Amino acid sequence: MLQKKKYQKKSSKIIINKKAYYNYFIEKVFQSGLVLEGWEIKSIRSGKVNISESYIINDRNEMYLCNCLIEPLQMSSNRFSCDPTRKKKLLLHKNEIDFLSLKKKNTGYTMVSLSLFWKKSWCKLEFGLAKGKTAQDKRINLKKREWEQEKLKILKKTKETY
């Protein structure tokens, strides 16, 4: 019998917002769909997207991704206007929208986009409920990371000697 070839699953992440992990404490992570136009999907497939300064707002009980820059391709049709920074609607359940709007309003959280990824043929957004870090928090994080790297180096040296 012929065996089916097992294919390696490639990373489906399109772009990761590393700045968000540096500037915010991420409390909880959510996934949502995006309402996109055809030219936006083509631009995302070619990698012309930037989410480093993007955030999520609540407008009339609907969530929108703001300040996400999707550059239009040169070969796009001129029949319609391409607004690179338009608000993109997030597809979330009603209870998720209520939970997020309550957290944002009462406790001072913000919603920051973390990454864009493909799920089958759909483009999805991963965003987090976050609180801002102070300069002191950032320094503490940096010291922890440096100490972890130093520990790994020490362990590596001790393994080589034995």
Swiss-Prot record:
A GO term, aspect molecular function: RNA binding
Superkingdom assignment: Bacteria
Sorted UniProt keywords: Cytoplasm, RNA-binding
Protein name: SsrA-binding protein
Signal sequence, renumbered to the chain: none
Function: Required for rescue of stalled ribosomes mediated by trans-translation. Binds to transfer-messenger RNA (tmRNA), required for stable association of tmRNA with ribosomes. tmRNA and SmpB together mimic tRNA shape, replacing the anticodon stem-loop with SmpB. tmRNA is encoded by the ssrA gene; the 2 termini fold to resemble tRNA(Ala) and it encodes a 'tag peptide', a short internal open reading frame. During trans-translation Ala-aminoacylated tmRNA acts like a tRNA, entering the A-site of stalled ribosomes, displacing the stalled mRNA.
GO cellular component annotations of the record: cytosol
Acetylation found in the keyword field: no
Gene: smpB
The keyword DNA-binding appears for this protein: no
Source organism: Buchnera aphidicola subsp. Acyrthosiphon pisum (strain APS)
GO-annotated biological processes: trans-translation
Similarity remark: Belongs to the SmpB family.
HAMAP family: SmpB
Major location category of this protein: cytoplasm
Pfam families according to UniProt: SmpB
Cellular localization per UniProt: Cytoplasm
Cross-referenced NCBIfam families: PRK05422.1, smpB
